Structures are given as C-alpha cells and as structure tokens.
C-alpha cells in the first residue's frame, strides 16, 4: 500500500478515536497505568489525539513537493487554541516498569561521548566557522566551536561557557576535553552535549513525547505555507526570544549580517521557514527523534545516502516469505 494512503488511513483511525473519546463522560480519566502515572482526562485525551492527527497529516511527506501538498488548512484548524495540548504529553520514567525508560535519550544525553551534531548547533554560528566546516572535505571534518548570541548554545561569557541547553565537557580542572573516539573518524566529532535535562533524564522524571512547542511551530509552518507570515511570527518568537534571548524575527526574516540567527548553509541570513525549523530542532532536541528526521527529509536536507523511509522489519518479511530488503546507501529510497 502506498505510504500516503497508509498515512491517510492512520489519520482516519485517530479521528474515529477522537469521536469515541468525546462520547465518554466529562469526568472520564485514563487509568494511571496506561500512560505511567499521568492523569489524563477526556478533553486532554482528545487534544493528545489531535496532536497525533497533526503529525500524521504532516510527517508522511518524503520530499519538499509532498510537504507542500499537506492539507495545511486542516493543520491550522487542528492546532487552533483549545484543540491541542497545553502541557507536555509525557511518561514518568521508572526503571522498574518496562517501556517507560528511554534508551535513545540515554545514548544521546550521555555525558561521556554523546554529542549534539554540528549540523544542529551550526546554524546558530555568526562567525563563519560553520560554513568553513561545511566546505571542508567530509573525511577531514572535526569538532568546531561556534559563536552565537543564542543563549541556549553558549552563555553570555563567551563560547567556552555553557548555554541553557548545551554545554562543553570539561575535566576536574574545568578544562575542555574531547572524549569521542577516533575509531570511526573525526567527522562526527562535536564539542557540544545536551545539558538541559541532566544525565539521568532517560530513567528519572518526565520524558516528553509531545510538546506544545511542536504544535505551535507546526501551526507557524501552516501560516507560512498559506501566505500568512505575520501570523507565524509570534509563534516563532515565543521560544526564540524567551529561551534563546535572540532578537525577534519579523515578516522580513531573522535580521541582517553579521548577527542574524539562524544562517543558511551558504552563510546568508535565514528566512522565517529557517527560523521555524531552527526553533523546532533546538527546543525539541530531546523529544521524539523521528520528528527531526521527518522534517529533514521533507525539506530535502538529509545527507546523501540516508534512508528516506523504513523498510518492513526483517522478521515480518521472513514470516511472509518475502525477500529481505533495505533503504539507504545506494539503494532505492535513499536521499540524493
């Protein structure tokens, strides 16, 4: 079945779930065991389901052309105030309960050799370092240090200080130290690690699955796609100004050189769509990695050879007696 048809089928199933949830008594709440220790009433359940419908409407797209074909009017309708979540939809992590801890968070937030990719941090750079890194032959790339007014990346004290969300590893004397291993090359080397949630976030406390920030920025994208940039501006500025301490964007974009953030890969100032994507990646860095991969493929930004979609699991294929296949590399279904 074509993936677009499957996405539409999934949306219809979720819409049926919304209709059924609305028939429940107003005092209905989900059992605490369903979403570990979360009190979710009927109306909140509907808002969560609406969020998943929005995801289904948007994230199926594999290409820029398909992303443009999304029903953005319906996205606007579903992301209107009152229709989507107003607090994080999360799961309480508990090492004694299977399925509540996050191995992905553990591996991406490790304070030893887990790092934030340079392509995540790089667009914040105003020094030109990131553009020089992009122009460096792939095998010769290594870590870089950016300079940025975005206080989520580094502090006001300069590029060696920690930001609100990212920091640089140091030894007991406070000296920067690189602990990534060279066995796989230095291409993936980065100075930056996530510090927003601490080292035990993957197994302690609330692990967000969906955020109001995601819904607000999808709404901003809908406004941009429908030719209403003025309506997108305040949604982009919510986190940009409050958390990044960056100047607000306007309908004309992110400002002018040399201080604009984010920048495009060629070093020019980003437009509103760039600013929206940048906010989404920085703010939701630890929420559902599939979101960022889906965004990047639909904007044509995946690195060459990356898989564009997931194959059917090998075990399923074996049960069905079908040949094993995959995507990525030079296979069909790979990013050009």
Regions found by a protein language model. Name each.
Residues 1-115, 152-153, 157-336:
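Acidic/polar-rich alpha-helix caps and helix-coil junctions
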Residues 118-163:
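C-terminal amphipathic alpha-helical segment
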